[in-house]
Amino acid sequence: MFALGDLNLTYLVSITAVSLYVSTAAVALSAALGLPISLAVGFRDFYGKSVVTSVISTGMGFPSVVVGLVVLLVLSRSGPLGTFELLFTPEAMILSQTILALPVLVSVSLSAVQSVPQDLRDAAFAAGGTSTDIALLVVREARYGIVTALLAAYGRAISEVGSVLIVGGNIVFSDSTSFTRTLTTAITVEARKGNIETGIALGAILLALVLGVNALGARFRDRTPGRNGRGR
């Protein structure tokens, strides 16, 4: 029924590999930036905290094409980062996906951090724990929620099409290997060609990846303390 047999195996493996590479790199970068933000915001009460959390939540709804356009302008030859010549490269795609995945990761991990009981933090402080000790304790207690945040961000990144199409250029070489074409942009190409069955086949692969990520996320959500009476 589906036209997977019509696809070059090299092409199929290549676009899947690019999708996984770009999404994984974007989530890793988002984690490096986002987890410290989640801990900093979750640990402290400060003036304007509600505004910060509102901005983070709003960021989850960033239109991907707008993000792609902004990154395009920044990386273009006349843009501030034009000298690095990153436009239409996997690195440009990673940057755009990081911008989209970061608010998701921060928002979900912040909720996990804030769900750790204050009494637990106070007890650790009373026992002589340093700020680092308390931070590590909170991370350990919120670990399932943090993993859920990582998986949610990954699902956001790997299903992205608008921004990666703008900044990546959807480039594939003559030997059928992909440079910046992903599963999502390949589906767009096949749909425009009228190859609906091939597009559906690629969509099935993408859907399987997303469902796998969501299944892992659901598993960790169920193991988060306070949910369904289960926890550690």
UniProtKB/Swiss-Prot annotation:
Domain ABC transmembrane type-1: 16-217
GO biological process per UniProt: transmembrane transport
Keywords: Cell membrane, Membrane, Transmembrane, Transmembrane helix, Transport
One Gene Ontology cellular component annotation held by this UniProt entry: plasma membrane
Cysteine-cysteine disulfides: none
Cellular compartments annotated: Cell membrane
Lineage: superkingdom: Archaea
Family, per entry: Belongs to the binding-protein-dependent transport system permease family.
Biological role stated in the UniProt entry: Part of an ABC transporter complex involved in anions import. Responsible for the translocation of the substrate across the membrane.
Subunit-structure text: The complex is composed of two ATP-binding proteins (HVO_1886), two transmembrane proteins (HVO_1887) and a solute-binding protein (HVO_1888).
PANTHER family the record matches: PERMEASE COMPONENT OF TUNGSTATE ABC TRANSPORTER (PTHR43632:SF1)
Protein name: Probable anion ABC transporter permease protein HVO_1887
Organism expressing this protein natively: Haloferax volcanii (strain ATCC 29605 / DSM 3757 / JCM 8879 / NBRC 14742 / NCIMB 2012 / VKM B-1768 / DS2) (Halobacterium volcanii)
Lineage: Archaea, Methanobacteriati, Methanobacteriota, Stenosarchaea group, Halobacteria
